[in-house]
Amino acid sequence: MAMIEVGFERQNFYPLKRKSALLLKLIAVVFAVLLFCEFLIYYLAIFQCNWPEVKTTAYDGEQASHEPVLKAMFLADTHLLGEFLGHWLDKLRREWQMERALQTALWLLQPEVVFILGDVFDEGKWSTPEAWADDVERFQKMFRHPSHVQLKVVAGNHDIGFHYEMNTYKVERFEKVFSSERLFSWKGINFVMVNSVAMNGDGCGICSEAEAELIEVSHRLNCSREARGSRRCGPGPLLPVSAPVLLQHYPLYRRSDANCSGDDAAPPEERDIPFKENYDVLSREASQKLLWWLQPRLVLSGHTHSACEVHHGGRVPEFSVPSFSWRNRNNPSFIMGSITPTDYALSKCYLPREDVVLVIYCGAVGFLVVLTLSHLGLLASPFLSGLNLLRKRKTR
């Protein structure tokens, strides 16, 4: 009787052991795939990015001086979803992607300043005060940064509305969180941050105020270029003698993306579609005003969600920064800039592709199914199938 009980216990033990082994294998595979796709893949992608090299020696006559280099990151169109649009899973997935991408970039690349070129939120143009507060809280969690790293944000049409939707309340609400700063100088470099939604030129109150601010900035920049102590400039502190970098959401006027190229440019079928002024790009008049007032050496913009490089007047380069979110692009990226008071160099850093991550997950699911069926004996292994075929041939 005792022998029968021992045999019965052994008979139950082996299936239990097989099930435990299967469960451990499944957990190990799931953990490994999640670890790679949700954490390690960002390190693998961003580790390949390097700060571009820039000349750091400036010459004033025959004297040479060493210029400091500012390491700046430029990203655009994060479009954090609000309470109305987008499925909760869509919101969770895309916001996690952006959070991991930024936190990994901050840790690996150690930038000194991060600029976001508008459309931080997707529903800022109509969100309630409660929804706005929730969106801001999520943004601050996702885009947290060390105290020595500065974060600068310009307004986009999804943050404060298109021109016909924009009002003082929305603008002040945005500027209360992200500052109303128009001119930012660091390491001898001037950055001008423009509310391009307010550059409609129709004389609206917000537009007139924005233009007046830019005229004042233009005056200060001109004073920095003139001889020190000029009567026209007054006794106030002068800006560094450096042509500014213009940062805004809308691109300066261009007819279309027909001359844009690259993996992250607009799809070929969309490149020849004409742009609408004050909707897709700034108007000709507003663009000419900005170029005349500010005389920038470099322009960076967002809005189109795709990359493009154009030259205005044959001398002022503008780079449209692609969207940072998987929701707008399969291959998001950001721009890295090494900038000095007299020179700059830019390079692009690509984030993991969403389709690659999905393929890895699909492959993992297929592997788990095969592994489970194999353990349950419902799927013969290739080795056993080969042995059976050999036996059949020998018997013939």
Curated annotation (Swiss-Prot):
One Pfam short name: Metallophos
Classification via CDD domains: MPP_MPPE1
Entry membrane topology: Multi-pass membrane protein
GO CC aspect terms: endoplasmic reticulum exit site; endoplasmic reticulum-Golgi intermediate compartment membrane; Golgi apparatus
Residue stretches spanning the membrane: 27-47, 356-376
Superkingdom classification of source: Eukaryota
GO BP: endoplasmic reticulum to Golgi vesicle-mediated transport; GPI anchor biosynthetic process
Binding sites annotated in the UniProt record for a divalent metal cation 1: D119, N157, H249, H303
EC number: 3.1.-.-
Enzyme class: hydrolase
Cofactor(s) the record lists: Mn(2+)
Motif stretch (Di-lysine motif): 392-396
Keywords in alphabetical order: ER-Golgi transport, GPI-anchor biosynthesis, Hydrolase, Manganese, Membrane, Metal-binding, Transmembrane, Transmembrane helix, Transport
Primary localization: endoplasmic reticulum
Cofactor note: Binds 2 manganese ions per subunit.
Subcellular location: Endoplasmic reticulum-Golgi intermediate compartment membrane
InterPro entries for the chain: Calcineurin-like_PHP_ApaH, Metallo-depent_PP-like, MPP_MPPE1, PGAP5/Cdc1/Ted1
Its job: Metallophosphoesterase that catalyzes the removal of a side-chain ethanolamine-phosphate (EtNP) from the second mannose of the GPI-anchor protein intermediate. Participates in the glycan remodeling steps of GPI-anchor maturation to allow an efficient transport of GPI-anchor proteins from the endoplasmic reticulum to the Golgi.
Record text about domains: The di-lysine motif (KxKxx) acts as an endoplasmic reticulum retrieval signal.
PANTHER family: METALLO PHOSPHOESTERASE RELATED, METALLOPHOSPHOESTERASE 1
Family: Belongs to the metallophosphoesterase superfamily. MPPE1 family.
Summary of subunit composition and partner proteins: Interacts with GPI-anchor proteins (via the GPI portion). Interacts with TMED10.
Protein name: Metallophosphoesterase 1
